[in-house]
From Swiss-Prot:
GO terms for molecular function: imidazoleglycerol-phosphate synthase activity; lyase activity. Keywords: Amino-acid biosynthesis, Cytoplasm, Histidine biosynthesis, Lyase. Pfam families: His_biosynth (PF00977). Disulfide bonds: none annotated. GO terms for biological process: L-histidine biosynthetic process. The active site is at 11, 130. This is Imidazole glycerol phosphate synthase subunit HisF. IGPS catalyzes the conversion of PRFAR and glutamine to IGP, AICAR and glutamate. The HisF subunit catalyzes the cyclization activity that produces IGP and AICAR from PRFAR using the ammonia provided by the HisH subunit. Pathway: Amino-acid biosynthesis; L-histidine biosynthesis; L-histidine from 5-phospho-alpha-D-ribose 1-diphosphate: step 5/9. It comes from Rhodopseudomonas palustris (strain BisA53). Heterodimer of HisH and HisF.
Length: 255
């Protein structure tokens, strides 16, 4: 069985972490590279950077962040946000990203997923899905543009389609749960994870360590992504992993 992964996520705007980080030993809580180094030392399996910079002109700042992080850290790095072209992917991979996450651009043009997977390999193409339950129904709709724009597209159908086109992994965020600290949307997570043959990363709603276990055991995800429970020093990566091991999940634990 694959080892379950624990993945912290950093939102970066204009080269700075925006949600804030409260690590004890960080000299500069707003510097994403400092935060990445701390997570690497703490035993994170991977790290996800989400570039929420509004302007394309500041893209160079993010590339510098990726470069400096890749030089300083051993863990795999996924970068997403504003990825619209094959050239965007190439530049990020050359800067040191191991995987690139695409979201709105894949919804707008599905062929983009196929082109990216054929050029760079399925293993480094992640499709990020932001989904929200359709009121009164047992189905979920895809949203784009940072969750602001509904599409009417069914989340399960879309997940299956992008995987058939070459997505090697799905990063699934429940918009209903994001920021609530009430736990993952288990029906959504399991519905997607059970419908595709690639790894699914559960995201949105983690408030305690049991939620991480539930994402895997009940949601059938292969990895869990969280932000605030780690950023603010509430729990360490090691505490999360040890709790998951005690729950019977296969984890990579550094000595």
């Amino acid at each position: 069985m694959f080892k379950v992964r624990v993945i912290p996520c950093l939102d970066v705007k204009d080269g700075r972490v925006v949600k804030g980080i409260n690590f004890v030993d960080l000299r500069d809580a707003g510097d994403p590279v400092e935060a990445a180094i701390a997570y690497d030392a703490a035993g994170a399996d991977e790290l996800t950077f989400l570039d929420i910079t509004a302007t394309h002109e500041n893209r160079g700042i993010m590339l510098d962040v990726v470069r400096r992080t890749a030089e300083a850290c051993f863990m795999p790095l996924t970068v997403g946000g504003g990825v619209r072209t094959v050239d965007d992917i190439k530049t990020l991979l050359r800067s040191g990203a191991d995987k690139v996450s695409i979201n709105s651009a894949a919804v707008a043009r599905r062929e983009f997923v196929k082109e990216a997977a054929e050029k760079f390999g399925e293993q480094c193409i992640v499709v990020a899905i932001d989904a929200k339950r359709v009121p009164g129904k047992d189905r979920w709709e895809i949203f784009t543009h940072g969750g602001r724009k509904g599409t009417g597209i069914d989340a399960i159908d879309y997940a299956q389609e992008v995987v058939s086109l070459g997505a090697g992994e799905i990063l699934l965020t429940s918009m209903d749960r994001d920021g609530t600290r009430q736990g993952f949307d288990i029906p959504l997570t399991s519905a997607i994870a059970d419908s595709v043959p690639v790894p699914v990363i559960a995201s949105g709603g983690v408030g305690n360590l049991d939620h991480l276990v539930e994402g895997i055991a009940k949601g059938h995800a292969t990895a869990v992504l969280a932000a605030s429970i780690f950023h603010f020093g509430e729990f360490t990566i090691r505490q999360a992993k040890e709790h998951m091991v005690r729950s019977g999940l296969p984890m990579r634990l550094d000595p």
